[in-house]
Amino acid sequence: MTPELITFGRYLAGEFENQRQAQAEPVWYVHLRLWLRPLPLFREDSIALFAEQASIINLDQPYRPRLWRLTHSESGGLEVRHYMFNDLKSVQGAGKNPDILRKISLEDLTFLPTCTLAVKVNTLADNQYQFIAQPQPEQRCQFTYEGTTYQVALGFEVTSHSLKTYDKGLDPGTGKGIWGALLGPYQYEKKRDFSAELDV
């Protein structure tokens, strides 16, 4: 793994909250906690992160579990591959429960080939970077779970201390946004650092 990929993983591995944003604009942004927890999968060439979030007032009801695989693209750049869990309920709560995390295996996952993000790297200062993950042009992230087809628009920006997420759900028929970052990104600050859990 390259130093660039490892830095990308270190920036993302953590527990994040958008407390300031939610206090400033409570009508538009729910106060969320987001977990990005390292997993010992794809270790030969990638960093795997379990992603999950919850409203602060319902931390015992996390939702949107998914797996991010940070790796290199065929062209040599960085990319983020998204995986869906075959049984969402079986992994619910893994963001704050390492016992559930440890039980996750490759057999629990389905790769979503239309949901891969290309990553651009900007140098901000000495040893300080910004990673911007965006979908490929004309790419539609669609998948089916329990007979229902979903479409989402994905994307994020991360630095050593902050994370902006652009994820939003779309109506597959009209393409209109129905949930998520409809008025701009969710703006998170890192509250806990999980980079020590990375196997690099």
From Swiss-Prot:
Keyword Zinc recorded: no
MF annotations from Gene Ontology: lyase activity
Top class in the EC scheme: lyase
Database matches in Pfam families: CpeT
Keywords: Lyase
Domain of life: Bacteria
Keyword rRNA-binding in annotation: no
EC number(s) on file: 4.-.-.-
InterPro entries referenced in this protein's UniProt entry, alphabetically: CpcT/CpeT (IPR010404), CpcT/CpeT_sf (IPR038672)
Function text: Covalently attaches a chromophore to Cys residue(s) of phycobiliproteins.
UniProt record similarity statement: Belongs to the CpcT/CpeT biliprotein lyase family.
Listed name of the protein: Chromophore lyase CpcT/CpeT 2
Species for this entry: Microcystis aeruginosa (strain NIES-843 / IAM M-2473)
Lineage: Bacteria, Bacillati, Cyanobacteriota, Cyanophyceae, Oscillatoriophycideae
Gene name, Swiss-Prot/TrEMBL: cpcT2
